[in-house]
Amino acid sequence: MKLSNIKSKEVVRILQKQGFEIKRQSGTHIIMRNNGKIVVVPIHKQIIPIETLKTIEKQSGINFREIIS
């Protein structure tokens, strides 16, 4: 799977495996938290844009490229 073809559900699943918990949903965004880190995942589109995914990587400290390879 290419990094540019990752879906919102997959991002949420990866974050949960890394210890993030869903705290709430605000409209079309899921707010997740782990040890003070807050990550916002948009769920209004099937595939997350690459720039948004880079922001999620920065917020979470997780490298999705390593996990999905």
Explain the meaning of each model-derived region:
Residues 1-69:
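Basic nucleic-acid-binding interfaces
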